[in-house]
Amino acid sequence: GACLAILAFSGLFMYDENGQLVPDLAESYEMTEDGLSYTFTMKDGLKWSDGTELNAKDVEYSWQRLANPDTGADYAYLTTVIATKDDGTLDIEASEDGKTFSVNLVAPCAYFLDLCAFPAFYPVPQASVEGADGYADNPGAWCTEAGFVSSGPMVCTGWKHNESMTYE
């Protein structure tokens, strides 16, 4: 799963060929002195594979979706390092212009940037996710066939279930 996800999707950070953590969708980030808050600045010109803009609002949507119990996400527990608001949602926010993304943590977390490179934290396209037939009953319905909207270096162009996937 994750090996294929990194072909089709990108995160705020990634690991380079030397295993070093480097910005991917993020251009830069700032962390407060106490290690409790991060602000990421997104790169300009980011696009989904369908040509629509990818920005910090997509990251916010995706992280809230990951933490939402209704999605049944296997890795939702990883979001417990992030503070929550009174309504139970994650204490994260994209700027109105979609250029920056802010995160507040419950405590300093030495591996937080590593989480930003983990596939569960990769942004997903809200319009595709919520526009998929069967979305209400199957939160993963949007990406069950070749051609799903993605953000990574490759696009899934062929999918023979339980047999093979083709990426170009």
Segment roles from a protein language model:
Residues F13, E17, K47, Q64-T71, ...:
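Sec-exported extracytoplasmic/periplasmic mature domains
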Residues T41, E60, A76-G131, G158-K160:
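Surface-exposed binding/hinge segments that line
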Residues S28-A73, S102-N104:
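Aromatic- and charge-enriched surface segment that lines or borders ligand/interaction sites
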Residues G1-A2, L25-A26, T52, F112-P123:
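A structural "hinge/loop" feature
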Residues A117-E168:
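Gly/Pro-rich hinge or "lid" segments in bacterial periplasmic/extracellular proteins
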Residues A5-F9, V22, A26, A56-W63, ...:
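Extracytoplasmic/secreted envelope proteins and their assembly/folding machinery
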Residues G1-L4, L46, N162:
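Extracytoplasmic "Venus flytrap"
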